[in-house]
């Protein structure tokens, strides 16, 4: 039982007026540790008990069983709990040493599937930093859901269909050089894409030609289909090379084109349920009863289907295929209205499982404050950026530890980890400005800072030749170690909060706090001094390294043993 639950249960015994869960949610952490480890504000009981909060706190403090705590005292309207540091540190260290990386593993999911729609770059366009957010947030959530006992199903819903392929075919037919495209497929295709869009701004016939080629593609025209397949194959080769660098894998690459033959069923279902309404020649579903002003446009007046029709088909396919407990879409916040419509249409169709679908939105990445745009050629391409991050990491490692073995592998872990961590430490609804120098810094709230704290602990453990024993009782009671113990004890709750809120930044901030607390401990404590506390301190180091490594793993970041 964690300490918050313990305190809530003890208060509940003497306060029948409040449920234990309500008490748990009211508990606060005092700003000053001299005021205790946790505090219960008595204000919430003033109306019920018709007494002043100060009096309630004083009376309840006397009734609470103190045997589980160092002491329980009333201070004004608060009941302050001082935890038994020796007892709790012993319990926490034993749990981590016994479980290892399985510490804080939970069984909420009971093996049920979670479908995660993530990454989903557009075919024939470069994989940019803009796609990175969806990729790393989705990958981290997959690790988190697995830690909660779910089975994640990672789906790369590739953007492999649409009018842009008409544009690309027009561009390739006008200016394409087969040898150049084969040599540098994505670079050449990007140049063609930017050039044709620039021409389309002044020449309206370009759009008409593109629409015609896309119609041919939809009708299965041989030349159009072969070009489309070639663009898709070349793009996937490049994407998979990048995913390998990021250590990200997928369970499905079913993209937009996969659902081409599955949309008629959606239209038939909507028709059968009398949900389609004609509006200016188009087919729509009215969603006003869900507070959604604009109807969902299902089919345009020219008979063309839209993204939402395809996404309805995908949602049905995923439910039938995976029978998901949750289905999450890691997609930018600009698509919020689309996903509200998607859920509402499914609800109208009678599918209550639409309640299990969540749009995990996120903010934009900017560069120098400016929005990124593939169409305008204003992009930060991931491949050269990763290479530069690895080079910067290698330079710092060379300066700190020139004799390090396997420098290249460590530099890769640090460089890639730096980019991922910087993204994930940002609350996902907030955007951030891309700053590679800040990302790869070993100072501040960065991935390399956390990785270096882990490597430092491993160095201490190697120097001491220490491996903890599961049969030995370790305990500590000093203030610096107590801060670390409290964080380690909180790890299961941090995982749960990260999962419940679909918010990896909670985990990233926890990792920063734990690394900072250890570095403070390291600065104030002579860990390797040969006295009666040495093994206790080393057991704390071992537990801290175990949890730091696991926190980083849940973010999709490596934890090198040496740096």
UniProtKB/Swiss-Prot annotation:
GO terms for biological process: arginyl-tRNA aminoacylation. It is an enzyme of class 6 (ligase). Coiled coil: none annotated. One of its GO terms (cellular component) is cytoplasm. The keyword Protein biosynthesis applies. GO terms for molecular function: arginine-tRNA ligase activity; ATP binding. It comes from the Bacteria. CDD domains: Anticodon_Ia_Arg, ArgRS_core. Keywords: Aminoacyl-tRNA synthetase, ATP-binding, Cytoplasm, Ligase, Nucleotide-binding, Protein biosynthesis. Monomer. HAMAP family: Arg_tRNA_synth. This is Arginine--tRNA ligase. It comes from Streptococcus pyogenes serotype M2 (strain MGAS10270).
């Amino acid at each position: 039982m964690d300490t918050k639950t313990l305190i809530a249960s003890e208060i509940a015994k003497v306060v029948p007026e409040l449920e234990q869960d309500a008490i748990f949610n009211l508990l606060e952490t005092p700003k000053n540790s001299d005021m205790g480890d946790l505090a219960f504000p008595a204000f919430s009981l003033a109306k019920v008990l018709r007494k002043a909060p100060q009096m309630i706190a004083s009376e309840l403090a006397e009734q609470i069983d103190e045997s589980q705590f160092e002491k329980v005292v009333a201070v004004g309207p608060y009941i302050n709990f001082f935890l038994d540091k020796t007892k709790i540190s012993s319990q926490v260290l034993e749990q981590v040493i016994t479980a290892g990386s399985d510490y804080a593993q939970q069984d909420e999911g009971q093996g049920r599937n979670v479908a995660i729609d993530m990454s989903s770059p557009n075919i024939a366009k470069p994989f940019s930093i803009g796609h990175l957010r969806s990729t790393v947030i989705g990958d981290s959530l997959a690790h988190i859901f697995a830690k909660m006992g779910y089975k994640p199903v990672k789906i790369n819903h590739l953007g492999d269909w649409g009018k842009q392929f008409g544009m690309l075919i027009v561009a390739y037919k006008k200016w394409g050089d087969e040898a150049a495209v084969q040599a540098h497929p994505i670079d050449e295709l990007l140049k063609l894409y930017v050039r044709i869009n620039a021409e389309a701004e002044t020449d309206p016939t370009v759009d008409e030609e593109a629409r015609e080629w896309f119609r041919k593609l939809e009708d299965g025209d041989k030349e159009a289909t072969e070009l489309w397949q070639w663009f898709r194959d070349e793009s996937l080769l490049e994407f998979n090379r990048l995913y390998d660098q990021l250590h990200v894998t997928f369970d499905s690459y079913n993209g937009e084109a996969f659902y081409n033959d599955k949309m008629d069923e959606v239209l038939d279902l909507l028709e059968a349920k009398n949900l389609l309404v004609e509006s200016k020649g188009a087919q729509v579903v009215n969603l006003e009863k869900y507070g959604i002003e604009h109807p969902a446009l299902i089919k345009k007046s020219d008979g063309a289907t839209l993204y939402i029709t395809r996404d309805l088909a995908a949602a049905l396919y995923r439910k039938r295929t995976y029978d998901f407990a949750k289905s999450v879409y890691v997609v930018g916040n600009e698509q919020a209205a689309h996903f509200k419509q998607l859920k509402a249409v499914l609800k109208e169709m009678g599918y209550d499982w639409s309640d299990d679908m969540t749009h995990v939105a996120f903010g934009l990445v900017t560069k120098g404050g400016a929005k990124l745009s593939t169409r305008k050629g204003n992009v930060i391409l991931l491949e050269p950026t990763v290479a530069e991050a690895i080079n910067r990491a290698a330079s710092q490692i060379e300066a700190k530890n020139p004799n390090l073995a396997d420098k290249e592998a460590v530099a890769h872990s640090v460089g890639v980890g730096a980019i991922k961590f910087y993204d994930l430490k940002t609350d996902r609804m907030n955007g951030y400005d891309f700053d590679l120098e800040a990302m790869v810094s070993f100072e501040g709230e960065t991935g390399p800072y956390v990785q270096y704290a882990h490597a430092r602990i491993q160095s201490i453990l190697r120097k001491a030749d220490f491996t903890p024993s599961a049969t030995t009782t370790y305990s500590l009671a000093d203030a610096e170690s107590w801060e670390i113990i409290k964080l380690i004890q909180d790890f299961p709750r941090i995982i749960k909060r990260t999962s419940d809120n679909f918010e990896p930044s909670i985990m990233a901030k926890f990792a920063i706090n734990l690394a900072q607390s250890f570095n403070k401990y390291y600065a104030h404590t002579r860990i390797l001094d040969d006295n009666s506390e040495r093994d206790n301190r080393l057991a704390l180091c071992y537990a801290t390294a175990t949890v730091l490594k696991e926190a980083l793993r849940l973010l999709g970041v490596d934890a090198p043993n040496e740096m």
